[in-house]
Amino acid sequence: MKSLFAAALSAAALLALAAPTVGRAATPAAAARPPAAAAAGKTLKPFASEREFRRAMARLLGSNASRRHYAPPVPVAPDAPVAPAAPAQPVPAPLAAAANKGTTLDRIQVTGSRIQSPSAGSPSADTITNVQTQGVDEGDIVKKQGDYLIVLRRGRLFSLDTGGDRLRAVSSIDAFAPGSDPSDTWYDEMLVADGTVVVIGYSYDRGGTEIGLFDLQAGGGLRYRATYQLRSSDYYSARNYASRLIGKTLIFYAPMSLEDYETDRPDARLPALRHWRSGATPADFRRILPATAIYTAPGLLDPHDVALHAVTQCELGGPRMRCRSSAVLGADSRTFYVSEDAVYVWTSRDPDPDHPGRPNAAVFRMPLDGRPPSALRASGSPVDQMSFLQRDGWLNVLVGNDAEGEAMWASRTRTGDLALLRVRLSEFGDGRGIAHRAAYRPLPQANIYDYDLHARFIGDWLVFGFGGYWGDKDGVDVKRAFALRYARREPVSTLRLAHAVERVDALGPDAILIGTDRDDEEQVSTRALHFTSLRLGAAARVAGHHLQTGATQSDDRTHGFFYRPEDADNGLLGLPVIADDGDGGARVLFLRNRRLDLSAAGALASSADAGRRRDDGCVVSCVDWYGDARPIFAGQRVYALLGYELVEGRRDGGRIVERRRLDFTPRAKVSR
């Protein structure tokens, strides 16, 4: 994911999917649809046995036919009727605490369990992450558990005590297993549940996702518990996060390329899990994905563009991690989104030039309660998870006919012509159904091709705009945003701005747009960061504006921003920025929201000598791919996480000023 070659993104020009009446919009041309019974009320079929799966893979991937970029889909039909999937069984209650948390392989459960999510409208007091769906936590670099902030940074975990009036470092520990070699591994994100700290990473050396478990002890100490290694391809996305947490259930998505699948060694390229131990070998891996939990649909697979998309759920309620996994077969290009009760995986391939308008995508719905997945054929692709919303029995997705999904840096390529797809969940079925042409709403006024798309569903609205460019920027005006009620066929509102749109986020029921007025990244001192508030009421309109000169965002991921409402109309927001102070000093900027009137509320900055601090001895995961700064609102206290500094603020005449700071730079090199 962090290899240099991956940054060189392909930008192939794709052909139109649209009917002539709507230009190049992502609306598919009229096509013969299967009977309604073929879609509604049905689900995908799993393979009936390991033998059937292996035979299907041999037919699909074993052909010696010449390789064509636009190969026709190859049906994967069973030789005999497939037995229905076994009904989901609840995962047994967590085992009683075991005295020995040693290195024996934990039992793998391939069964279902209904996830108990926190009640809507009552976010936890420990919530400090700007998540997409309330009650669905997302992996990040800092989490709160009781009095403690847990920070994941440069291959280590740190616990910081903020209880009472304290601000002190308590404990630090390697983010990997003692005695293991972390070389060529990236420890990206973290979650916390009832004293269990979960670190998610990816190892190029071992070829899989790593899940590290640590105990947060009563006094704030950190203790290593276990490491699990899941064979997978790289999950990295410049915008999305690999892991989610609902209650005590860990959910993570991992793709698995089948490009090197060997029909005579099928287990070598399928998801498997091992509990790491000293001296672990490949033989320790155990399949957690039986063929009877792999689903497909006739006609959706291309032998030259196929991957296995796996969703794994693990229960964290006991000393042993219990996991189950299911997967769908689809095209390699993907975007995934987690709602409160399902994981959606959107896969797509290049359009077929011989059949313009033929659906080139499929969206899979994988319920979190253990029921079989379902699917719907579609056209185009979303650019990231923020392009999705499941609500009130509908799925809404903003798609582009040139978009290539979110893998690696694909979200930062052109989107092409845009459309809003809105379909009922009841339309998902056995994979033969096609989204109706009428389900797409073309958005021709928003077709800006060579700029990054940023979008978010907020209340009843979809708000989006365009920021940094990657192609030809001449003559393109990106200083505008678009807003529409996604459930209504009302005109799209075009909002004139003083800046491009590099972030869309929520201010309670309303919106904020953030971006710069220049795209010359070498001229930071002449750039200005704009904040524009939008009122989303009877109509969408610009309500307020704030200008911060000589600054740019230091992190464009969703987690860089946080808004704390004080009541229905007022609140405080924080955003990491890089200021023009001579050496690119980092800080968290705070703004006050008063009925959508935005005003400066101070900043908390890193120390002047932060860039010249002692060597931290980093040996692994030494690039901050997920950023290194966050605004943190914990109760009535306000902090800025800035690298190895935690700066606490206090209110002074309506502004946030520094009260004190904690430097938790490690004093010893990371052990290996």
Regions found by a protein language model. Give the residues of each.
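Amphipathic, positively biased hydrophobic alpha-helical segments used for protein targeting
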Residues: 18-19, 254
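Positively charged n-region of N-terminal signal peptides that target proteins for export
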Residues: 1-4
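Bacterial N-terminal signal peptides
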Residues: 7-18
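Beta-sheet-rich non-transmembrane sensory/scaffold domains
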Residues: 26-672
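Sec/Tat signal peptide C-region and signal peptidase I cleavage site
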Residues: 21-24
